[in-house]
Every structure is written in structure tokens, then in C-alpha cells.
Amino acid sequence: MSACSVFVYDGDTPLDLTKAVIGLEWGDMKGELAARAVLRMNARMGGAELAEYARLNAPISILAYGREVFSGVIWDYSLIDGRTVNMVCYDRLIFLSGSADSAYFPAGLNTRRVLESICRRWDMPLKYDYTGCTHGRLSYRAQSVASQIISTLDAAQAVCGDKYMLRMEGGTLHVGLRGAGKPVCDVSRARLISYTHRRDMSGLVTRVAITTGSSGPVRVREVFDGDTSLGILQEVVDASGATLSDARTQARRLLIERGTPVETIEVACQDEPTLRRGDRVTVSAGSLAGEYDVLGVMHDRLLSMQMELARHTDGEG
């Protein structure tokens, strides 16, 4: 019996395609809003053409040990030489990524109310347990619905400092704190296949100078230092067209966002099929020790997974 099962739905009737599966991956990729599944299958199953069952926009689900780990629709279907079929499937968030709309929100609304309004227009159930902030005026013109949601959350994150996560859970869009709750799994050296831990000073800022003087000599008004132990890498904030208070806020934000080297952590290990983007894991292997947030994860039918991680920080979860 395979640990993974694949079902496509004809109305309410599930059709088991597991025996046709040759290759299977699923998960939440960093930089992609919608969860994705990629399947490679035999074009015929039980004497019938797979195309009779697997149609574009047909609901599809993947189960691991009897528990659903992916639910979406067939988005891309390719028949190759009449023998194999490649399918790319996404969850419902793909419709928000592929749909453009315009929306206006007056100043004074909090993040929850903005997202509730956007989701209501698109018949998307919302579970919200993120912190958020009070927003200024928001105007979205001919932007994808997904972009409106992400832009709103990015603005809130910049103000409150709490990292957010969003993902589909059982037909509901869940917006919450990244890394909330207890670690989902413990990746020790016994479960580890490989890892890459990279630190990069590109884009690092250790000092910010605030300047004025748009029409005359440039004057340095203030200097903010971060961690200069790695040397001086300076950014300049021009306060000529803004208040000094706003310039100070921008300088502090630069040091928060870019004041430490960029860290890239990739881990391959034995699978935890239910692990999702936004979950927290514990890792103890080589230079990695502690709790990490999952930025992206892909699982496969061979019961291994590839994760991209970020260090979990206090205040998240």
C-alpha cells in the first residue's frame, strides 16, 4: 500500500488515481502564494484514458497515510507521446493570484477589516489571527487580488514588526503569525539528508546617514549606527522632502530590515507530510541549532522533503 494517495473528483465522486502515479511533489513554495502539486502519471489506467477523469479545473486531493495534505484543482495538463501525463495543480489561492480588481479603503481601517472586505468580495472564507495595524488610505487599481492582500500585510508587518503567514486550510484562507504554536517536528541528524547554510553580506546596511539640502550643499543631519563589527556599509536617507521624524523612522527600519547578513537555510530530511509554510520546526545539525520558521517546503512520494527556513525570533508565535 502506497503512503500517498491521489484522488480526482467527478462531482462528489472520488476517483482513485494512485496506481497511475509515477512521480509526485506537493507543498508551499517560497514566493508562491498558492500551494502547488506536480504529478507525473501513466496516460492510461485500468484500460481507460486518464483524460476521461483528469480535466482542467477538476478538484484533486493528495493524502498521506490517509490524511489530506493537498487540496486544489488541475491547472495545467500535458499529454506526452500518448504515454505519460504531467499535471500541475494549485489550491484555491491561484484564483486570487490570477484575478485583477480595484479597491479603495479610507484611512483608519485596521488590517483585519481590509482583508475581510477583500475576501468577502471574492467569496473567500477568512480565518484571521494576525496582529496588524491601523492603515492610512489604501488604493489598489487593477491589481491582482493576491497582490492587494500581500501589500496590505506587508504594510502591517512594516509597522508592527510581526512576521505574517498566509495559506489555505480546508477551504479557508488563514492569515496568522509566522511560526506560531509549538514546533511541528524535530529535525535531528538522524532525519537529516543534507543542508546548506549560507550567510551573505550583499545588501547589508550597518550605518544610515540622514541628509538634507536638495538645492544647496548636502548636510548630514544625523547618523544611525547598527552592528558595525562587519565594517561600515552606509545607506543614505534624504530628508529634504520629508520630516526629520519620518527620516529617522526610515533609517531605523533600514537597520532592522537590512542590518544583519542575509541568511539562507535549506534542509532536506525525512518527511513530515503535514508540514506547511508558516509552521515552526526544531533543527539540530551542524551549524543549525534551535527553532526555525518554514518559508517554503516541498514533499515527495519517496517521503522526503525540502525546506527553506528562517530563524524563529522572539515575538513570533
PLM region spans:
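Assembly/oligomerization scaffold segments
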Residues: M1-L96, V184-T196
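Acidic, small/polar-enriched beta strand-loop surface segments
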Residues: S2-F7, D154, K163-D300, S304, ...
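Short beta-strand and beta-hairpin "edge-sheet" elements
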Residues: K19, S61-C89, M165, V281-R311
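Flexible glycine-/small-residue-rich
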Residues: M41, C89-D91, L177-G179, T212, ...
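Charged- and aromatic-enriched interaction segments used to assemble
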Residues: D81-R191, Y195-H197
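Glycine- and charge-enriched low-complexity intrinsically disordered segments
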Residues: P106, T313-G317
